[in-house]
Amino acid sequence: MISFSSFYQQIADSNLQHWLEELPAILGQWQREHKHGNLPKWEKVLNKLHYPAPDRIDFTTRVEVGSGDQLSKGQQEKLKNLLKLFCPWRKGPFDLHGIHIDTEWRSDWKWERVQPHISPLKNRTVLDVGCGSGYHMWRMLGDGAKRVVGIDPSPLFLCQFEAVKRLAGNDHPVHLLPLGIEQLPPLDAFDTVFSMGVLYHRRSPIDHLLQLRDQLRTGGELVLETLVVDGDENTVLVPGERYGKMNNVWFLPSAKALEAWLKKADFVDVRCVDIDVTSLAEQRSTEWMPNESLVDYLDPNDVSLTVEGYPAPKRATFIAVKNQPNKDLV
């Protein structure tokens, strides 16, 4: 069974220690709820990942663990077959002992858009909300973060992350907790909080912004990336049953409306640093994610629209700072 004991040990003498009052019980409940289904099968695969310590690691320009020269052809093929059991791989790419995991998303492109605008991560404690399989967490570590905690409730994402971590070495201060942000006790401790690709999935986006704020220390930085539409500060798209075939998209604000939401949630120094239309090269089907992808979600006659007729995905990145506590916001 996947253990979180090393995480508890690492935060025992840190500014995250108050989580120890509640998180062990919360994660214990998660483990009990997932003792059936796919998780035990994936854990058996994880237990087969016994490979030599990597001869090289690069988290600064990519996520690379081990060179292609370290394993025999047979060992590489066995490793590839094991990693294939964790398909679909959505966020990446990863290079593991010479095996290139070409994921659905080019998450490295998103990082290249976001990273130049954020405060340096050196020695910072970072929370990544909706972290997926953890690609950006490794890049944050590569940029010098002291500790990175990611949260995402998906058991598959947890196992994909654990596969990379076991190959890289378990001593890295990066941890994925299979939880949603609503399950986290407020901490007011993180230097930087990322929420990328999450806000439009929330029924109450303002509550999500307040939950993000509650994890930040005063003066800490929020990095928020989400879908937006064109329009003024009063423009918000509320899709019907589906948006891009997704049935869990609730609100798509304009960039100006999102700026107003952030200020309403008591963030200051709010600025939009990037707006980018998602390209068919950035999100697509691959060997490692052979299911439908962006091209299938767009109008075949007009890629500026989704199949439902809404504007095609456009993503904005905002940077904001947590203000002094406001007792009127609860």
Swiss-Prot record:
Keyword Transferase on entry: yes
SUPFAM superfamilies: S-adenosyl-L-methionine-dependent methyltransferases
A GO biological-process term: tRNA wobble uridine modification
Top-level enzyme category: transferase
Domain of life: Bacteria
Keyword Membrane: no
One Pfam short name: Methyltransf_9
Listed GO MF terms: methyltransferase activity; transferase activity, transferring alkyl or aryl (other than methyl) groups
Protein name: tRNA U34 carboxymethyltransferase
